[in-house]
């Protein structure tokens, strides 16, 4: 448990109280307590005096203490019994907060999406104070869009489901090995369904275990070589499991990894040699003999090719253009993480705790880059607080051996095109990240002018999540990617691949362009808690898909080389 868990609890209780129609002062008390914790620079393990914080009283403290001691909240459980379950999902609808939903519940008897839709269709909602005809129309539109089964899932959702499935597979008996296949193995940013290849000598036993997986809504197929199920999570998710022998595993894995175009190209090569590729192996057409391979590497070697990384198996052209001389970045080459947050802004853990987690990963360095003063919602740091934070970092650096914490900041590029700090403040930083968090709807030329201001400032080292997109949720702001890459090249400023699975920004095609131009890239997690540091794996996979070579990745370099880059404009 960390501080963010408690903040979420307090905010959730406030929302439920609002839905119930409780006294606004009680609602406010829980929101104030959440804000008090958010604004305190310490992590949960460092706080032994919560009652001394302005905003936390006896009532809210007793709720916090129960949650810490017992891992549950009787206050929240009681509220959940009193508030209709169907009201909570309505909070996801744009324009509907707790107060408005409480009004709909109290005055119209709205208790779920269906009853809200009915009230709107009967034009009852527009008659309530605080609503109108346009509000009613927007609610109906939002209800129509909510809960729709997307054709393809964002990779972040697919990864969550995959990890849950793999946790079960790793505990099954009679499985020799298993692997993801399909578009998830190729690291596509959206995924239609999940595919697994399982090597086993006991397919019947494995099949029975697969049919006992939790969350199965329906079974589509259940044979000795294939089990297909629909799993019910946030969305209904189709999963195919293919059961093969160990010797068939490499060619089956290759076949079902795809892509279609990659497989077509490989089949053409085989045909020219008088061979035929199938999921079972490589058949010599003349004799009917089928050859299998110990691994995909030997499969490709059979055709005189290097092992082509699954992430780049897309157009088929990679069969001709990829060679062993291309050194795509690997997770083990990452030496540090240069974008993360602590309790000084909106992170869940202290600088020490984040540093200790990075040391456990074997990193040589990290950068603490809390939000700047403009982002008040994230408890952004004033220039004075940056100075105070620097003292804490200095003390930790004096304590740690063979590890360096870089003093940094994630500075907002403001809507008017100026930067959130003056140059004299930035000059004191080891590393400066610049990013856009506001006014996404500005026209392209205005956005580009904002980015240019940052890129041409000699103190700015990195542009974070350069397009602002969220996969499947937000397209991001309008930018000229070619101009951005050229500016980054000219100013020798690094562009970030934000490894958060919801972002993966820069995207694949942008990474390809940046790599072609030799732009310095940096793979950062933007971690707001210790668990998010693990997103580096997803980021590296996304970087590989964009043909990112080790030589172009800033945080694959030694501390000495990183420091040289950061001082390039001195």
Curated annotation (Swiss-Prot):
Transmembrane segments in this chain: where? none
Query: Which cofactors does this gene product need?
Result: Mn(2+); Mg(2+)
UniProt record, GO biological process: DNA repair; DNA replication
Listed binding positions for a divalent metal cation 1 are 193, 195
Per UniProt, where does a divalent metal cation 2 bind?
193, 195, 240
Write out the ranges of the annotated region (3'-5' exonuclease). 333-570
InterPro entries, per the entry: DNA-dir_DNA_pol_X, DNA_pol_b-like_N, DNA_pol_lamdba_lyase_dom_sf, DNA_Pol_thumb_sf, Hlx-hairpin-Hlx_DNA-bd_motif, NT_sf, PHP_dom, PHP_phosphatase
Q: Provide the alphabetized UniProt keywords.
A: DNA damage, DNA repair, DNA replication, DNA synthesis, DNA-binding, DNA-directed DNA polymerase, Hydrolase, Magnesium, Manganese, Metal-binding, Multifunctional enzyme, Nucleotidyltransferase, Transferase
* Binding, Mn(2+) 1: 339, 341, 410, 526
Q: Where is this region: DNA polymerase type-X?
A: 1-315
**What's known about how it's activated or inhibited?**
The polymerization activity is inhibited in the presence of 2'-3'-dideoxynucleoside 5'-triphosphate (ddNTP).
Q: Which domain of life is it from?
A: Bacteria
Residue sites binding Mn(2+) 2 per the record: 371, 528
Instruction: From the record, give the cysteines joined by S-S bonds.
Output: none
Gene3D superfamilies attached here? 5' to 3' exonuclease, C-terminal subdomain, Beta Polymerase, domain 2, DNA polymerase beta, N-terminal domain-like, DNA polymerase, thumb domain, Metal-dependent hydrolases
* Catalyzed reactions per annotation: DNA(n) + a 2'-deoxyribonucleoside 5'-triphosphate = DNA(n+1) + diphosphate; Exonucleolytic cleavage in the 3'- to 5'-direction to yield nucleoside 5'-phosphates
Q: Report the sequence similarity comment from the record.
A: In the N-terminal section; belongs to the DNA polymerase type-X family. In the C-terminal section; belongs to the PHP family.
Supply the domain comment.
Answer: The 3'-5' exonuclease activity resides in the C-terminal PHP domain.
Could you give the subunit structure recorded for this chain? Monomer.
Q: What's this protein's name?
A: DNA polymerase/3'-5' exonuclease PolX
Organism name:
Bacillus subtilis (strain 168)
